[in-house]
Amino acid sequence: MKHPFLTLATIVALGTNLTAQQQQPYPLPLEEAMHILLTNNNAIKISRNTTEIAKAQKQQLNAAWYPTIAATGGYFHFSNDISAQANMGELAQDALANLESALPGLEQILQQLLPQLEQSLSALGNITLSVPLIQQNVTTLDAAALWPLFTGGKRIFAGKIGKELHTTALHLETLVTNAQMAAMLNAYYTLKLSNDVLTMQTGNLQYISKLLDDARRLKEEGFINKGEFLVVQVACDNAVRELENARHNKKVASRALSAILGIGQEITPCGNWFILDSLPCIHSIQQEILCNNAQLKILHSQDNILHNRENIARSNYLPDIALFARGNIYSHNVPKNLLPRSTVGAAMQWTLFDGLAREKEIKKTRLEQEQVDYTISQTESDLTTAATALHSALEDAACNIQTLERTMDLARELLRERERGFAEGFCTSTEVIEARTALTKANTALNLAHWQYCTTLANLLALGSNTEKFIELHNEYRQ
């Protein structure tokens, strides 16, 4: 109980090492993190599945070029048998008329041979002849084929739409993958920044704790007053608070990275800070982004889809022509003389008026194309502005890194001079604390500048759908 604050500071300083020994965080290189992301990330899995769906849809549209073959059949029960009825007298009169036309004079010969012919024909007029055609229960099974020959170009344009849908899905997969890569890199370097800050704050607390011991000893020996001792004690209290904040920030950053990667183990990033020797000019970066950006490619694919939809709407003005064939496989109680066993032919369907639906569809498609064109123009403008802002942020971060590296050298030299002066009695503990604080702030600012540079570079590469290049640059320029 003699020095309770010192005991608390020591426990807090050692807490990081104890926690690390218990949890044993997994050292994760940047390349492995990227591989885990591509394997485990659900958003990327969904985009890949969407691509497969679009591919299947494209193949489904190609089926319109082939004939459709189907089997149709049924069992029918009628309320009564179907039969043909006719008057015998009328049939006889018709038969005699046909014979008379074929053999002139036949009627006179028959009247001589059969004097009662007229009476017989009159008697037949009272008799009705009934011929059964189809019985009450009927069963039939047919095979039918339909092969469209001409559709006005609908199949051609539908095939183009299928290809564009597949292309759109591929661009969407690229967009999602690059967005998730950029998010992972931001989370990865945020965790690295948190680790570096935690290590720095741990060392800072250990340093100030040692300085507090020296200040207590000098106070007891009468070399410094109570005010100077309290300055060191307040600095130690602030160091404890900063260390706790650093630990909390590390936990938050670790959870964010684990969520993106889809793993539950605690991670220690092994990637390095790096900075490029030089940046390409902003014009070349903007052109590359406008050529490769996945969002722009998706919009262009949508424009092509709408153009083909308009062509399909125009093709509705033309007739549809198809070949058809039907063959009976099995039939029961269906005579051949009433229903032929096979049929082949060609059919045409031509819509002459549909309530102006075709005209409205063409107008709607044109308006949608205009909307997509406006969106493309606005997206290009937004991408150009974003590229300019990110390029400027990269230049600022690079300039800050160079300046802060010189500031770090000066802060280290200042701290060494203050420590030497404090040991010889020429400097107070307050001056040593100020020098240490300046070094800590410079180190924090340098790490923050490195974080800003790396994350900004990742976001800039993501605009051009080329985030995987970040790994190459990291391996080439890492410090």
Model regions: which residues?
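Periplasmic alpha-helical coiled-coil/stalk elements that build and connect Gram-negative outer-membrane
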Residues: 28, 56-58, 171-290, 393, ...
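Transmembrane beta-barrel architecture of outer-membrane proteins
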Residues: 138-140, 186, 231, 320, ...
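Bacterial Sec-dependent N-terminal signal peptides
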Residues: 1-30
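Small/polar (Gly/Ser/Thr/Ala-rich) solvent-exposed segments
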Residues: 45, 68-83, 126-136, 146-175, ...
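Acidic, low-complexity, intrinsically disordered peripheral segments
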Residues: 7, 21-23, 70, 77-98, ...
